[in-house]
Amino acid sequence: MVLSLTGNSVGSGQTYQWQESTTIGGPFTNIGASSNSSVLNILASTTKYYQCEVTCSGNSQLSTPVLVTVNPSFPGGNYTINSALPTSGSNFQTFNDFKNALNCGIAGAIVVNVVAGSGPYNEQVEFGEITGVSSVNTITINGNGNVLTYGATVSTAPGTLVLNGTDYMTVNNLTVEGTGTTYALVCHLWNNADNNTFSNCTFNAPVNGTSTSMVPFSISGSATSGTASGNSGINNVITGCTMFSGYYNTAIVGNSSLPSTGNQVINCNILDQYNYATYFLYQNGLVFRGNTLSRPTRTNLSTYYGIYLSTGNTNALVERNKIRNTFATNPTSTSIQYSIYCTIDATLGNENKFSNNVISDINSNGTVYGFYMSGSDYWKAYHNTISLDDASSTATGTTYGFYCTGSLAYDVRNNIVSISRGGTGTKYDVYYSNPSAATSDYNDLYMNASAGTNNIGYNGTAYTTLAAWQSGSGKDANSVSVDPLYVAPGTYDYTPSNGLVNDAGTPVGVTDDINGAPRSLTSPDMGAYEFSLGGLDAGITWFTPTSPSSPGLKTITVNIDNTQAQTINSIQLSYSDGGAPVVQTFTGLGLTSGNNTNLSFTTQYN
């Protein structure tokens, strides 16, 4: 509290002595020593009267006493928010009534339950800095499925639920909506809002909204922008939430001079944004885990940025995420897709890490990047599955599994890249413009597109086969190029069933898979899923011809026997006459245990 005088005359040599008393009649006691300034900063903890003794040339005068009432901190305990009841000692009729009760701080942990079915609550709520909060004295809001909604109309106040410097708040099971036609920072944290948790909440921006001021969830350095840098927040956790629509869907931006630490987005659904599914800047140690990113219902579509990491990101852990179904309502769109976008240089020992992610079901006619790592150094991509297999596409643009133009130290191992996308555009499993920077090995680089110029790899020269790529680049010596034979891609199950990618990886420190299943510590599987053939095996009983019998083309037939318990539905066979192998996948077999069948190659042997 600041004490000062108004209406007094000022002269040389005056001194000021502030005094306090519990009653207006005194006695008053001095607060510290006298000063030549009339301004005094004090901490007021109880209600008292204050006056100032002004002395000039030995003469003293007293100011009129002023009563300063100090409200006590809000007591810890359990409370309710219920619009059907008036605000009282234990209930608050609105969220703002609850917020106002915290203005003088808290004296203990607070739990407030929004009574089920008591909403919706149509109000704009901004919590500020709350004294007394700590890791023990927390504030918990249990939404119980209620809706907090607001239609912002001005750029200076675009939020519905705002945490302005608020710490140690937990919000559970609350739906928050922004319905403004231009402004909708639905849930927005800024100004050093730290140590907050949002669990099982839903944050909705307007359907098909395109304004850059529409962001379902944001942490930034500005009251009015979801993507501005500055003092934003650290150690915030968003878990089990759904973020819907927006221009940006989920944005976390720190301070350019001191990046934010400890922010996490875990097991969330990030849906139907116009442009950026995520937008991360100036973060150290960001965790982005177990999230599903898609655009299943949005009808107006633009360029798709999935996981976007740019300036100031180091030590990011991006794992177990699924990016899929991003052009569901317009598969003929020619907009570009950047599934994972990273344009930042980390440093040695502070690499950004990408593991156990699945990119699939990208049904469009535009250029597609699985990993877009433009000018990005010091990163690691392990055990990712990239399936760019939309055979109905007519794309003329390029398709990339990995697009990498960094010049220092990046590592691509144990990944599956399968491309059978239609269209006449050029395709690459891996594209390294500075190959000396790349460690690339133990990958499945499968190319089976029906049209276009199709390449396994690029290092300044394009190579159409794995053997040529290995010889020409010196990369991927232990890699394979086989159809992964995904178990059920129609239901997003991209577990391989091809034994040639089983146990074919190398240990890189990723000890579990996308589902949390433990990986082999010596021979992990390629791709995001650790799997076992588990009673699935076949033997070759016989094949013909076994030797040249006469000149001319001959059909090679192989008799396959199911030697294990599981039914064999598909199998991949190959033969070679000393040149490039002829590979064919046979599907729809239905070969049960103990039975055999004849399989004939369509490409004849000469």
Please name every model-derived segment.
Residues 77-115, 120, 126, 467-469, ...:
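Acidic Gly/Asp/Thr-rich repetitive segments characteristic of extracellular carbohydrate-active
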Residues 439-449, 463-530:
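C-terminal accessory segments
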Residues 533-606:
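Extracellular/luminal regions of secreted and cell-surface proteins that mediate adhesion/ECM remodeling
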